[in-house]
Amino acid sequence: VGVIGHADRARPLRDYCLGLMMPCERKSVEPMAAVTAPERTAAQHQSLLHFVGEGRWSDEMVLAKVREMVLPEIERHGPIEAWIIDDTGFPKKGTHSVGVARQYCGQLGKEDNCQVAVSLSIANADASLPAAYRLYLPQEWAKDSARLRKAGVPDDAGFKTKHEIALDQLRWACEAGLPRGVALLDAGYGNNSELRADITGLGLTYVAGILSNTTVWPRGTGPLPP
């Protein structure tokens, strides 16, 4: 309760998380209300809508509390071995959810209408735990101040590339003293040479996927001048 501010938010938080895990096609508030409280759907809809849209609580504090509770259990099976950078797409049918746009959705394996979140998970061979999570805000959203205000997005939420978000998360994890692991990145991130250099600058070892047409030069060599 301490991390969400008020005791009366505990029930909506539980119901919202339950709704996200239920096998309903749409993960918006209305269908979630119907499956989590079928006997009082209208009241549940208002409760969840207020919690998600107007309730003030820190997602970072929630993640920190989860990490405090779960990380010791993971480390019982062995030390943290990897920091995994990835993004997750959430298919959407409408246009009002924050950050929704036509973009690549890994869940569908193609471009489609979706939201995308960049995450950093810490893991060993037994389990993984999301340590940082941020919604990617496409430029078409970041440049539309009226759309941002209507959706309740904070004024200081500017545009950042997915690579910049990933680097922010890795830098934060280093500063926060999370147990170190090898940074793992797929080609969507690993093919960015600036990101790889910045990760090295953080003192991290990384294993990164790259595209098959990437040119690689041995250390100390390079292309001849034109």
Each PLM stretch: what is its role?
Residues 23, 35, 76-77, 176, ...:
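Alpha-helix C-cap/termination motif
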Residues 52-139, 144, 149:
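Active-site-proximal, Lys/Arg-enriched surface segment
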Residues 146-226:
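An internal, acidic/charged active-site-proximal segment
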Residues 15, 115-118, 164-171:
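Short, contiguous clusters of charged residues that form electrostatic/catalytic patches at enzyme active sites
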Residues 35, 68-72, 168-176:
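A generic secondary-structure signal
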Residues 3, 18-22, 38, 106-110, ...:
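Short, charged/polar micro-motifs that form catalytic or ligand-binding hotspots
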Residues 1-53, 58:
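Gly/serine-rich nucleotide phosphate-binding loop at the start of the catalytic core
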Residues 2-5, 130, 145, 170-171:
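Short, flexible segments with low predicted structural confidence
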